[in-house]
Curated annotation (Swiss-Prot):
<comment type="pathway">
    <text>Amino-acid biosynthesis; L-methionine biosynthesis via salvage pathway; L-methionine from S-methyl-5-thio-alpha-D-ribose 1-phosphate: step 5/6.</text>
</comment>
<feature type="site" description="May play a role in transmitting local conformational changes">
    <location>
        <position position="102"/>
    </location>
</feature>
<keyword id="KW-0479">Metal-binding</keyword>
<feature type="binding site">
    <location>
        <position position="99"/>
    </location>
    <ligand>
        <name>Ni(2+)</name>
    </ligand>
</feature>
<dbReference type="InterPro" id="IPR014710">
    <property type="entry name" value="RmlC-like_jellyroll"/>
</dbReference>
<keyword id="KW-0028">Amino-acid biosynthesis</keyword>
<dbReference type="GO" id="GO:0019509">
    <property type="term" value="P:L-methionine salvage from methylthioadenosine"/>
</dbReference>
<dbReference type="GO" id="GO:0010308">
    <property type="term" value="F:acireductone dioxygenase (Ni2+-requiring) activity"/>
</dbReference>
<dbReference type="GO" id="GO:0019284">
    <property type="term" value="P:L-methionine salvage from S-adenosylmethionine"/>
</dbReference>
<feature type="site" description="Important to generate the dianion">
    <location>
        <position position="105"/>
    </location>
</feature>
<comment type="subunit">
    <text>Monomer.</text>
</comment>
<dbReference type="InterPro" id="IPR023956">
    <property type="entry name" value="ARD_bac"/>
</dbReference>
<dbReference type="GO" id="GO:0010309">
    <property type="term" value="F:acireductone dioxygenase [iron(II)-requiring] activity"/>
</dbReference>
<protein>
    <recommendedName>
        <fullName>Acireductone dioxygenase</fullName>
        <ecNumber>1.13.11.54</ecNumber>
        <ecNumber>1.13.11.53</ecNumber>
    </recommendedName>
</protein>
<feature type="binding site">
    <location>
        <position position="97"/>
    </location>
    <ligand>
        <name>Ni(2+)</name>
    </ligand>
</feature>
<dbReference type="GO" id="GO:0005506">
    <property type="term" value="F:iron ion binding"/>
</dbReference>
<dbReference type="InterPro" id="IPR011051">
    <property type="entry name" value="RmlC_Cupin_sf"/>
</dbReference>
Length: 180
């Protein structure tokens, strides 16, 4: 179930707000310029689908985003618990970073935790299958795939080079709850 938990960026011990209601989540995030919507991820992708299979199955969703914002490229990230690089990938994404473009993800399987450092608050957004999130360019954030990752998401980019991060060097992510 999708969820949003908001913390002070000075105190990770006590949430200020929490909801699993998609409309409430969208309202809170939209007020900060973050797009959050529930889309439909209902295609049967089979076991361990190839990226091309995922792209073909959801080309209509990609086309919608391209028409809206003029995005130039897309790919698929899919990680499972048996991936030998899961620990290194998790560590990389857990470092707070920004992008020079929006970070757009459409979750078609599984779940992951986006953590957004906006002003003096941290917004932890548990995204799951059917969730579309677009984090505005320049927003400090990190992503937690969990110790046993299980997700497939379509990534949409302005930059034809794909995922390019600028790490902030802030260790804030270490203080906040992680996805198990």
């Amino acid at each position: 179930m999708s969820a949003l938990t908001i913390y002070s960026d000075k105190d990770a011990s006590q949430p200020q707000w929490h909801s699993t209601d998609a409309a409430e989540i969208a309202q809170q995030l939209n007020a900060k310029g973050v797009r959050f919507e529930r889309w439909v991820a209902d295609r049967d992708l089979g076991q361990a689908p190839a990226p091309e299979t995922v792209i073909t199955a959801y080309q209509h969703a990609i086309d919608k985003l391209v028409a809206e914002k003029g995005y130039q490229s897309w790919d698929v990230i899919s990680l499972r618990a048996d991936n030998p690089q899961k620990e290194a990938l998790r560590a990389k994404f857990l470092n707070e970073h920004t992008h020079g473009e929006d970070e757009v993800r459409f979750f078609v399987e599984g779940a992951g935790l986006f953590c957004l450092h906006i002003g003096d608050q941290v917004y932890q957004v548990l995204c799951e299958k059917n969730d579309l999130i677009s984090v505005p360019a320049g927003t400090p954030h990190w992503f937690d795939m969990g110790s046993e990752p299980n997700f497939t998401a379509i990534r949409i980019f302005d930059n034809p080079e794909g995922w390019v991060a600028q790490f902030t060097g802030d260790a804030i992510a270490d203080a906040y709850p992680r996805l198990l």
